[in-house]
Amino acid sequence: MSTESMIRDVELAEEALPRKTAGPQGSRRCWFLSLFSFLLVAGATTLFCLLHFGVIGPQREEFPKDPSLISPLAQAVRSSSRTPSDKPVVHVVANPQAEGQLQWLNRRANALLANGVELTDNQLVVPSEGLYLIYSQVLFKGQGCPSNHVLLTHTISRIAVSYQTKVNLLSAIKSPCQRETPEGAEAKPWYEPIYLGGVFQLEKGDRLSAEINLPDYLDFAESGQVYFGIIAL
């Protein structure tokens, strides 16, 4: 709102006030009203000028140029954001062309194999000791339910360097069928995902595998549905 508009509104407000007979109280009231109107217009004009010329307004946060004045935590956050991570990480995906088996590939879109992790004999080889997040997902698909009960399993196993024995780290079992599809009835499709994930202490040279029991039920219709990976913490 401009200053001229504010002055015009004040004048119209004064004209709208009822006229009273002149007297000591009426003169004093008119004097106070005029003084208030003047102060209101002057204050609004001053505020408008200060905002227009940028004298007041939102302040920008400024960081000190001297690094010693920045907190150690802030320095660590800023330096880590500029330094690439050297922690082992891998994300492999299933090969949709491998019929009857679950084969992992790292040379595919959205796959990753970095900082020492190896994919050997369909197993992930841990490059260094430490805590790791291990995860995997598979998606099963079928048409109708057969007479024999369908049990789907997904397991992540570890073969440690210290003892050459396969040990299950994570495992899950699901059954997509509650009852057999009646003869002559429509065989409806079903989908059953299984996700596994957990944090484990691993040693250098440990081998990890992600396996299933019924690979013929795997669904490769869309990418990113079947994967396996580890992330060093």
UniProtKB/Swiss-Prot annotation:
Glycan-carrying positions: S80
Lipidation sites (N6-myristoyl lysine):
K20
| All copies of domain THD, residue ranges | 88-233
GO biological process terms, alphabetically, are:
extrinsic apoptotic signaling pathway via death domain receptors; immune response; necroptotic signaling pathway; negative regulation of protein-containing complex disassembly; positive regulation of apoptotic process; positive regulation of canonical NF-kappaB signal transduction; positive regulation of extrinsic apoptotic signaling pathway; positive regulation of JUN kinase activity
SMART domains hit by this protein: TNF
> Per UniProt, what is one Pfam family of this protein?
TNF
- Provide the site residues for: Cleavage: S34, L35, L39, L40, C49, L50, L51, H52, A76, V77
Instruction: List the Gene Ontology MF annotations in alphabetical order.
Output: cytokine activity; tumor necrosis factor receptor binding
Q: Which residues cross the membrane?
A: 36-56
Residues with the Phosphoserine modification: S2
Q: Does the keyword Membrane apply?
A: yes
Q: Which residues lie on this side of the membrane: Extracellular?
A: 57-233
For this protein, what post-translational modification is recorded in UniProt?
A: The soluble form derives from the membrane form by proteolytic processing. The membrane-bound form is further proteolytically processed by SPPL2A or SPPL2B through regulated intramembrane proteolysis producing TNF intracellular domains (ICD1 and ICD2) released in the cytosol and TNF C-domain 1 and C-domain 2 secreted into the extracellular space. The membrane form, but not the soluble form, is phosphorylated on serine residues. Dephosphorylation of the membrane form occurs by binding to soluble TNFRSF1A/TNFR1.
User: InterPro entries given for it?
Assistant: TNF, TNF_alpha, TNF_CS, TNF_dom, Tumour_necrosis_fac-like_dom
- Establish whether keyword Transferase is in the entry: no
Q: Give the intrachain disulfide bonds.
A: C145-C177
Q: Which UniProt keywords apply?
A: Cell membrane, Cytokine, Disulfide bond, Glycoprotein, Lipoprotein, Membrane, Myristate, Phosphoprotein, Secreted, Signal-anchor, Transmembrane, Transmembrane helix
What is the membrane topology noted in the UniProt record heading this document? Answer: Single-pass type II membrane protein
Which residue spans belong to the Cytoplasmic compartment?
Answer: 1-35
**Annotated family:** Belongs to the tumor necrosis factor family.
What interactions and quaternary structure are annotated? Homotrimer. Interacts with SPPL2B.
Q: What does this protein do?
A: Cytokine that binds to TNFRSF1A/TNFR1 and TNFRSF1B/TNFBR. It is mainly secreted by macrophages and can induce cell death of certain tumor cell lines. It is potent pyrogen causing fever by direct action or by stimulation of interleukin-1 secretion and is implicated in the induction of cachexia, Under certain conditions it can stimulate cell proliferation and induce cell differentiation. Induces insulin resistance in adipocytes via inhibition of insulin-induced IRS1 tyrosine phosphorylation and insulin-induced glucose uptake. The TNF intracellular domain (ICD) form induces IL12 production in dendritic cells.
Q: Which PANTHER family match?
A: TUMOR NECROSIS FACTOR (PTHR11471:SF23), TUMOR NECROSIS FACTOR FAMILY MEMBER (PTHR11471)
Protein name, as recorded: Tumor necrosis factor
Which organism is this protein's natural source?
Papio hamadryas ursinus (Chacma baboon)
